[in-house]
């Protein structure tokens, strides 16, 4: 983990497990955390990727979703509180 950024690997999780893990990270993210990088995978993670992007795009703590060059990762950029 680098300062301001948290990584969360949800490979092999189902939607419910991933949601529980992501929600826990969002709850515990302190003021110094501005980004959560969610590693969902690409080949077998497409359904999970789409679910995460659709579910968290309107989350109150998420300012925006960024898609990187690596299609197996989705970044949640957090709002300042």
Regions from the PLM with identified roles:
Residues 1-81:
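Long, charged, low-complexity intrinsically disordered regions
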């Amino acid at each position: 983990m680098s300062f301001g950024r948290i990584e969360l690997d949800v490979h092999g999780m189902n939607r419910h497990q991933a949601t529980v893990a992501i929600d826990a990270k969002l709850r515990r993210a302190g003021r110094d955390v501005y980004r959560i990088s969610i590693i969902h995978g690409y080949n077998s993670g497409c359904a999970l990727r789409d679910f995460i992007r659709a579910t968290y795009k309107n989350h109150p703590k998420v300012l925006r979703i960024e898609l990187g060059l690596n299609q197996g990762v989705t970044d949640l950029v957090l709002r300042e509180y």
